[in-house]
Amino acid sequence: DFTGVKFDNTIGCGKG
């Protein structure tokens, strides 16, 4: 789950 400019690997799948 892409959040702003970070890579969210917890909720999403690390896609940026």
Swiss-Prot record:
State where it is primarily located.
Answer: secreted
Write out the GO biological process terms: lipid catabolic process
| Transmembrane residue ranges | none
Could you say which enzyme class this protein belongs to?
Answer: hydrolase
E.C. number(s) listed in UniProt? 3.1.1.4
Annotated Gene Ontology cellular component terms: extracellular region
Q: Where in the cell is it found?
A: Secreted
The protein's annotated catalytic reaction(s) are: a 1,2-diacyl-sn-glycero-3-phosphocholine + H2O = a 1-acyl-sn-glycero-3-phosphocholine + a fatty acid + H(+)
Q: Name one GO molecular function term.
A: phospholipase A2 activity
Mind listing the UniProt keywords for this protein, alphabetically?
Hydrolase, Lipid degradation, Lipid metabolism, Secreted
Tissue expression from the record: Expressed by the venom gland.
Job description of the protein: PLA2 catalyzes the calcium-dependent hydrolysis of the 2-acyl groups in 3-sn-phosphoglycerides.
Q: Could you identify this protein by its name? A: Phospholipase A2 1
Q: What is the lineage of its organism?
A: Eukaryota, Metazoa, Ecdysozoa, Arthropoda, Chelicerata
